[in-house]
From Swiss-Prot:
Residues 575-594, 927-938 have a biased composition (Low complexity). Residues 360-374 have a biased composition (Acidic residues). Residues 840-849 have a biased composition (Polar residues). This is Epstein-Barr nuclear antigen 4. Residues 1-92, 360-389, 431-471, 560-626, 694-767, 834-870, 919-938 are annotated as: Disordered. InterPro entries: EBNA-3/4/6. Interacts (via N-terminus) with host RBPJ. It is found in: Host nucleus. May be involved in transcriptional regulation of both viral and cellular genes by interacting with the host DNA-binding protein RBPJ. Its main location: host cell. Residues 698-713, 722-750 have a biased composition (Pro residues).
Length: 938
């Protein structure tokens, strides 16, 4: 190193003349091979001059590998660096540098080291890398030496060492005696989201003179990252988070970040603000005062010296400073609340635009300024390589990693995004599905209420008093109903095993064929234009002796449908509104008739809108499975409680009853038979699970008391209403709601499975507990197998038990629309006073209640002597009734449509008392089916 300085000094003294005296062997080559020629030790120092090396021309090695072109390129650089006012003159005047730490060396020595590194052609383009960056002394020396050593290792292959995984410690070049050394240092890294630190291992590859002879080099012992203390770690993290928040914040808040960073207090900023910036500053203060701002509070404390941010507008404004157009308290509170609601990352309102700096203009400006500069500088910058080519030979690498590039298998697990054929196929399939949905009108109104499934019995073609129903019928156009006053009724037809029914929605659901499902629904319910209708009565509206007043208008086209057995003197009837395929199913009081469940076929109206609901005679007869589950053994809980006062027939209802015999026993059907009387104007309930091949069983005497003898009252649960025998009173017309048009006779329809999903109509009160008991005919316990239940049903059927006779009164009318969505969901059953109760079906065979076990062996009771359920009474609680005209709910029946071979029953359960008190549910709480039961049903 000393010889290089002396040679340059002599060249400078000679004024750059061509005849200047230089060292004979190496003076013209500059200092390329002289770096590190003398041993450097930590005791002496790296820049100590030796007199012996100054006189001995052989003390420095001679560079043998540089060609003539390299020498020609290096000469002008030497002339440039050493000519004129070269700082080397000042440096060479100092005779010795003894015990000089590299950290304390003058900057001129560092510049000289950079020049020495740049003399090689491989390192020359890196001049800008060192001279254009703001580097401190340690970073400067580190970069100089590491880049020089790396480039030298690239140009010349190092001496191979077995299993050497790092840079080589020795070099084979005679003129490059500097080796390499790696230093490891564990430091802590900053984390932007908190105070936690993560240890990081930093490895620095350093160069050393004479291979591994010396432990220290130009960079050894200089680049040391100090460990940061916990307090400094907290401060640095706080300032880092503040800078990040400023970069992400809206533009109007960046001024306040700068003012706070400058040490200004919030009060000083407040009194110096203008009118237009006050609201923004209040929002900024609100953001500063967020409780979870740990780092921002630390940043604020470090900048201002205050422990936390305060509201500066609460202090008195100085008199000397004018305060024009002051803000009101409301404006201040709103602005502060907006600041409190901002995101913790940065003060930004939701409607603030995100400003992205456009680099195109800045690049154009820089390009124009660069064009005005020296062209040579631009060329040198263009020649700087982006990455240095370095492919060192790694020894000891396992052979398993030596794989050819062509042998690598491509990923075949995911589709290629550039293959548009797959995308087009998916889009075409989606387009077909969308077209199928648009062709079929939406049959399900947007209803939040769950649905109920009722299975319909087969069609009976025997003539009745009104004559047989016409086989050919035409479809009634479906009329969409208003949202809050509709009850959804879904028709769902199942097919027997072995019978291929094209329209079986259950099969389509199992196959998950949405296109075929839409086609079948389109055939069942063709799109028709809507017809204007008068105001309709809300769905599932129970009127009459229930004490319910309905302020809805009656429907102009009532249609009969089915329901569970009605109480003795006051039967019920469901009439869906203008359904395309519905059945007229009525209920009446049980009696000692010989045939159970006669088919209801009312009088044929001349203009029947439901004629097309029946299939043609040529079509194959539909076979209906037995989907319903069995109900409890004894008929005590099955018997509905009669109402306290009778109600006359509805003026618009003139049904006629026809008895249809059934062949199999009721034990095989999984249900206890009810045998209504065929006399009187009341219509009978048609059970929906009766197959088409049923015949009438032989008439057998019933063990029950004759209908003319009133039954003896028995012990009942506490609070149960006293049932009365069915009185024989003349029919009295029932009152209709005010303003309702005179309803017309119900049209003739066919039995069809349907689903009920009620929505609570406004202005109605809920039904009484008798209606709920009629709906919940199977409130028994779970867990018992169905064998006992079937045996009990067979014994009852063998005994020929029949219920007592009820007075023939008109049926109650319940209206509901009809549509086709194949959905099975639990619903809510409304108790007395409009209280909702959840109700669902279960596949678990249930056991009779405690009351039923007490009465076991006594024999069936007449329907008028059935006390209410103890379970229902214990779990019941009263809810205040809604006044007239208030919002209420309608009762609803739920049955689930299950697969073939399964049985159905109705279960009644209740939630715990504390749950009812908390939830505030209705009169009687009924348990809903569990997830396993629901999935089993589906």
């Amino acid at each position: 190193m000393k010889k290089a300085w002396l040679s340059r000094a002599r060249q400078a003294d000679a004024g750059g003349a061509s005849g200047s005296e230089d060292p004979p062997d190496y003076g013209d080559q500059g200092n390329v091979q002289q770096v590190g020629s003398g041993p450097i030790s930590p005791e002496i120092g790296p820049f100590e001059l030796s007199a012996a090396s100054e006189d001995d021309p052989q003390s420095g090695p001679v560079e043998e590998n540089l060609d003539a072109a390299a020498r020609e390129e290096q000469e002008p650089h030497e002339q440039e660096h050493n000519g004129g006012d070269d700082p080397l003159d000042v440096h060479t005047r100092q005779p010795r540098f003894v015990d000089v730490n590299p950290t304390q060396a003058p900057v001129i020595q560092l510049v000289h080291a950079v020049y020495d590194s740049m003399l090689q052609s491989d390192l020359r383009p890196l001049g800008s890398l060192f001279l254009e960056q703001n580097l401190n002394i340690e970073e400067f020396i580190w970069m100089c030496m590491t880049v020089r050593h790396r480039c030298q290792a690239i140009r010349k292959k190092p001496l191979p060492i077995v299993k050497q995984r790092r840079w080589k410690l020795l070099s084979s070049c005679r003129s490059w005696r500097m080796g390499y050394r790696t230093h490891n240092l564990k430091v802590n890294s900053f984390e932007s989201g908190g105070d936690n630190v993560h240890p990081v291992l930093v490895t620095a590859t350093l160069g050393c003179d004479e291979g591994t002879r010396h432990a220290t080099t130009y960079s050894a012992g200089i680049v040391q990252i100090p460990r940061i203390s916990d307090q400094n770690q907290k401060i640095e993290t706080a300032f880092l988070m503040a800078r990040r928040a400023r970069s992400l914040s809206a533009e109007r808040y960046t001024l306040f970040f700068d003012l706070v960073s400058s040490g200004n207090t919030l009060y000083a900023i407040w009194i110096g603000l203008g009118t237009k910036n006050r609201v923004s500053f209040i929002e900024f203060v609100g953001w500063l005062c967020k409780k979870d701002h740990t780092h921002i509070r630390e940043w604020f404390r470090q900048c201002t010296g205050r422990p936390k941010a305060a509201k500066p507008w609460l202090r008195a404004h100085p008199v000397a400073i004018p305060y024009d157009d002051p803000l009101t308290n409301e404006e201040i509170d709103l602005a502060y609340a907006r600041g409190q609601a901002m995101n913790i990352e940065a003060p930004r309102l939701p409607d603030d635009p995100i400003i992205v700096e456009d680099d195109d203009e800045s690049e154009e400006i820089e390009a124009e300024s660069d064009e005005e500069e020296d062209k040579s500088g631009m060329e040198s910058l263009k020649n700087i390589p982006q990455t240095l080519p370095y492919n060192p030979t790694v020894y000891g690498r396992p052979a398993v990693f030596d794989r050819k590039s062509d042998a690598k298998s491509t990923k075949k697990c995911r589709a290629i995004l550039t293959d548009f054929s797959v995308i087009k196929a998916i889009e075409e399939e989606h387009r077909k599905k969308k077209a199928a949905r648009t062709e079929q009108p939406r049959a399900t109104p947007e209803s939040q209420a769950p649905t109920v499934v009722l299975q319909r019995p087969p069609t009976q073609h025997e003539p009745g008093p009104a004559g047989p129903l016409s086989v050919q019928a035409r479809l009634e156009p479906w009329q969409p109903l208003p949202g809050p006053q509709v009850t959804t009724v879904l028709l769902h037809e199942e097919s027997m095993q072995g019978v291929q029914v094209h329209g079986s929605m259950l099969d389509l659901l199992e196959k998950d064929d949405e296109v075929m499902e839409q086609r079948v629904m389109a055939t069942l319910l063709p799109p028709v234009p809507q017809q204007p209708q008068a105001g309709r009565r809300g769905p599932c509206v129970y009127t009459g002796d229930l004490g319910i007043e309905s302020d809805e208008l009656a429907s102009t086209e009532p249609v009969h449908d089915q329901l569970l057995p009605a109480p003795g003197p006051d039967p019920l009837e469901i009439q869906p509104l203008t359904s395309p395929t519905t059945s007229q199913l009525s209920s009446s009081a049980p009696s000692c008739a010989q045939t159970p469940w006669p088919v209801v076929q009312p009088s044929q109206t001349p203009d029947d809108p439901m004629k097309q609901s029946r299939p043609p005679e040529t079509a194959a007869p539909r076979q209906w499975p037995m989907p319903l589950r069995p109900i409890p053994m004894r008929p005590l809980r099955m018997q509905p409680i009669p109402f306290n006062h009778p109600v006359g027939p509805t003026p618009h209802q003139t049904p006629q009853v026809e008895l249809t015999p059934y062949k199999p026993t009721w034990a095989q059907m999984g249900h206890i038979p009810y045998q209504p009387t065929p006399t009187g104007p009341a219509t009978m309930l048609l059970r929906q699970w009766a197959p088409a091949t049923m015949q009438t069983p032989p008439r057998a005497p019933t063990p029950m008391s004759p209908p003319e003898v009133p039954p003896v009252p028995r012990q009942r649960s506490r609070g149960a209403p006293t049932p009365t025998p069915p009185p024989q009173v003349p029919p009295v017309p029932r009152q209709r709601p005010r303003g309702a048009p005179t309803p017309t006779p119900p049209p003739q329809v066919l039995p069809t499975p349907m689903q009920l999903a009620p929505r609570a109509p406004a202005g109605q009160q809920g039904p009484t507990k008798q209606i709920l008991r009629q709906l919940l005919t199977g409130g028994v316990k779970k867990g018992r197998p169905s064998l006992k239940l079937q045996a009990a049903l067979e014994r009852q059927a063998a005994a020929g038990w029949q219920p007592s006779t009820g007075s023939g009164t008109s049926a109650k009318i319940v209206r509901a629309p009809v549509f086709y969505p194949p959905v099975l969901q639990p619903i809510q059953v409304m108790g007395q006073g409009g209280s909702p109760t959840a109700m669902a079906a279960s596949t678990v065979t249930q056991e009779p209640t405690e009351y039923t076990r007490e009465r076991r062996g006594v024999g069936p009771m007449p329907p008028t002597d059935i006390p209410p359920s103890k379970r229902a009474k214990i779990e019941a609680y009263t809810e205040p009734e809604m006044p007239h005209g208030g919002a209420s709910h309608s009762p609803v029946v739920i049955l689930e449509n299950v697969g073939q071979g399964q049985q159905q029953t109705l279960e009644c359960g209740g939630t715990a008392k504390q749950e009812r008190d908390v939830l505030g549910l209705g009169d009687i709480a009924v348990s809903s089916p569990s997830s396993s039961e629901t999935s089993n049903d589906e």
